[in-house]
Amino acid sequence: GPIPEVLKNYMDAQYYGEIGIGTPPQCFTVVFDTGSSNLWVPSIHCKLLDIACWIHHKYNSGKSSTYVKNGTTFAIHYGSGSLSGYLSSQDTVSVPCNSALSGVGGIKVERQTFGEATKQPGLTFIAAKFDGILGMAYPRISVNNVVPVFDNLMQQKLVDKDIFSFYLNRDPGAQPGGELMLGGIDSKYYKGSLDYHNVTRKAYWQIHMNQVAVGSSLTLCKGGCEAIVDTGTSLIVGQPEEVRELGKAIGAVPLIQGEYMIPCEKVPSLPDVTVTLGGKKYKLSSENYTLKVSQAGQTICLSGFMGMDIPPPGGPLWILGDVFIGRYYTVFDRDLNRVGLAEAA
């Protein structure tokens, strides 16, 4: 049957779960990221200057009986940080890490090629609560054409249905923080029925978006645009000029790097934002599209919409990140190449 993987939620901004690599399994926390296609974790061979490496779990190939050396070098670039190291090798990936302990039958994906990261520049990965990233997008965007974990999982016939589904809890204090269901759909996490939207380009989980309406006054993505559904992005990302207009409409103040803040007392009176996909309307209330961020006793309210340019050939694209997925339970269907959405329970 389907395998549930429990996720932890850190401040509504990072969702991650535990996997094992090697025999016996070495445990790592990873972001299950539908916006990329590679798996990487920090390496025991990381450079001394790599601070991110000091504070995270590290893979030691010498301790695994199923390790196969590969050694090709690689570099991966994300929206927020880049990473270089070497394409380590092949080994067995277990989800969850120790299935015997969790009482759920887990799965083991054999001969999975992944990256052992030896260099992680910048602050991006130091602040991360997770060790690595497990990409769940299509093979087309996999660096070095490595076969992604879910593709290997399908080929090894480890699930009955070639689908996986995400529930992301938007209450940072509540348990569980979320759930990734491999090979199925967990009906306890949504209400009503699922509506499906066809993938328009099999690279990211890309679908067609009809429009984004802010209250009754402003329409963005007029005449339609393309959007990707991305569990690895915290916010909803749009083109800078469109998000600037949206910011004006909701009284948001530009912060840095395309992010905006909103005076917390204004949040309850802000208009709904409605995303239309395939003729279905997906409403987000101001409570859904704002994030409360507390630091040093101060609470600020961050807009859930961020402006960022995604240039051709991939872009221009909107990104429907955790702000959206938290409100709408999401099914990623590799069998029929479609994305299913229903209101999260």
Curated annotation (Swiss-Prot):
What post-translational events are described? N- and O-glycosylated.
Q: Where in the cell is it found?
A: Lysosome; Melanosome; Secreted, Extracellular space
Give an example GO biological process. Answer: proteolysis
Which InterPro entries does the entry link to? Aspartic_peptidase_A1 (IPR001461), Aspartic_peptidase_AS (IPR001969), PEPTIDASE_A1 (IPR033121), Peptidase_aspartic_dom_sf (IPR021109)
Give the EC class as a word.
hydrolase
Catalytic center residues: D33, D230
Q: Which cysteines are joined by disulfide bonds?
A: C46-C53, C221-C225, C264-C301
Q: Which UniProt keywords apply?
A: Aspartyl protease, Disulfide bond, Glycoprotein, Hydrolase, Lysosome, Protease, Secreted, Zymogen
Q: Which GO terms describe its molecular function?
A: aspartic-type endopeptidase activity
Which residues form the pro-region?
A: 99-103
What family does the database annotate? Belongs to the peptidase A1 family.
- How is the quaternary structure described? Consists of a light chain and a heavy chain. Interacts with ADAM30; this leads to activation of CTSD. Interacts with GRN; stabilizes CTSD; increases its proteolytic activity.
Function of the molecule: Acid protease active in intracellular protein breakdown. Plays a role in APP processing following cleavage and activation by ADAM30 which leads to APP degradation.
> What's the protein name?
Cathepsin D
Organism of derivation: Sus scrofa
